[in-house]
Amino acid sequence: MRATSKFHYLNQFHPGVWVATALLALNAFVWNSVRDWRGWRIHWGWPAGGWVPVLVALGVGLVVQARDGRGDAIYRERGFYGIIKISEFSLEGDDFRLLLNGRITHGYQFTEAEASGRVTTYYGPPTGVGLAVQYFPLEENATGGLRVGVGGLGVGTLAGYAGKGDYYRMYEINPQVVNLSSLEVGTFTYLLQAKERGAKVEVVLGDARLSMEEELRADKPQGFHVLALDAFSSDAIPVHLLTKESVAIYLKHLDPKGVL
C-alpha cells in the first residue's frame, strides 16, 4: 500500500538564514580599534556598515526560504546526501509526483491509477534503455524472464517495464530514496506494481560498484540481460563508476548477450 499518509513535514531553514545568523554573531564579538588623542583604545561595538551584509544575507535567505516552502512540497527531509523533497504538480490535466535531491530531479510518477504505471522521463519506450529492456532477445528455451540490473533507484521508473517472471535488481546508496520507493512503504509505486504483475524486485542498499564487486567475491554473478547505470547527480559525477576496472565488474555481471 502507498504510504501517502506517512508524509512528514520538516521545515528546513535555507543556508542563507544560517549565514545571516553567523554574521550577526560575528558582528556581536568584533572589537573595534579606535584611535584618539589618548592613543589606541579597544572597545566592544558594531563596525561601520556591519548591518548591511547581515540584512542582505538575512533577506535573501528568508526570500528563498519562503519560495522553497510553498505548498507544492509534500515531503522534505535532510540526510547525508542532501535534502530530499517530494512535490506534487498538475500539468495539462495530469497530476504527478516528483522526487528531487536538492535541485536535481530523480524521476516522477503520475498519481492517477490509470497512468501511474507509465514509464516517464528519459526511460521512455523510444529511449536506449527503453528499447533494450523491451526488445532484448531472450532465448526461446529460457527458463526465466528478463534479468535487469539498475544502478541508481530514483523512483523506480525502470520497473515500469517489469512483467511476470522478470527479475529487477536495483542498487541505491541513499536509504532515504530506498524508503520512498520500496515495496513495503513506498511513496512511489513502480516497484509495488511490478511485484503485482508477477515480477521479482530486490533493492540492494549501498554503492552500486562496491555491491556488485562484493557479489563477485561471493561467486554470485547476476547474469543481467540489461544493466543500466544512472547513479549520477548534476555535475558531481561518481568517477569510480566509470573506470576501466568498474566496467570489467559490470561485464562479469552480464549475460553473454547482455547489454550495458
Residue ranges: model-predicted function:
Residues 1-260:
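Alpha-helical transmembrane segments of multi-pass membrane proteins
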